């Protein structure tokens, strides 16, 4: 019952929480007060401050524009960025290295798909097995198209994979080149 009361915020709506529902139950050390039922047993008339801490507002007031990240940490006013926004951020942060890496990954991807398509492998069956919609695959594999156009269409279908590879690999490559001494370390902001 107390867990349900803690889960339900004011006015009975389900509230979003950034910490475990019942840290007192798990035995973790927190600065929170015990749940409502424990307050009712210990204090004949709990004051508003005790009720607020029992409701879950003891660590901090949750701002409406704060969002939890998968790792559990919270970004201030920053929302989760889309892949293209993350790619633009990498381009701004790493400059020519990020752009060069992404272009290189794209050219390698296009070359691989061109080789696969020109070798005669039925790519429509492979794409359907990978979970692409049949209408999308058939529109990309129109009859009478050249090998390069089909390879380019498949290359475009795999854009999220290329962007993910770029987002993961660019920081590692830059960090390696900085440790070797090919790149200067980033300038510290005053």
UniProtKB/Swiss-Prot annotation:
PANTHER family: PROTEIN FAM210B, MITOCHONDRIAL. Belongs to the FAM210 family. Residues 56-66 have a biased composition (Basic and acidic residues). Plays a role in erythroid differentiation. Involved in cell proliferation and tumor cell growth suppression. Involved in the metabolic reprogramming of cancer cells in a PDK4-dependent manner. It comes from Mus musculus. InterPro entries: FAM210A/B-like, FAM210A/B-like_dom. Residues 1-58 form a transit peptide. Its main location: mitochondrion. Keywords: Differentiation, Erythrocyte maturation, Membrane, Mitochondrion, Mitochondrion outer membrane, Transit peptide, Transmembrane, Transmembrane helix, Tumor suppressor. The chain crosses the membrane at residues 97-117, 148-168. GO terms for cellular component: membrane; mitochondrial outer membrane; mitochondrion. Pfam families: FAM210A-B_dom. The keyword Hydrolase does not apply. It is a multi-pass membrane protein. The lineage of its organism: Eukaryota, Metazoa, Chordata, Craniata, Vertebrata. The gene is Fam210b. It is found in: Mitochondrion; Mitochondrion outer membrane. One of its GO terms (biological process) is cellular response to estradiol stimulus. Expressed in late erythroblast differentiation stages. This is Protein FAM210B, mitochondrial. Residues 78-189 form the DUF1279 domain. Induction: Up-regulated by the erythroid transcription factor GATA1.
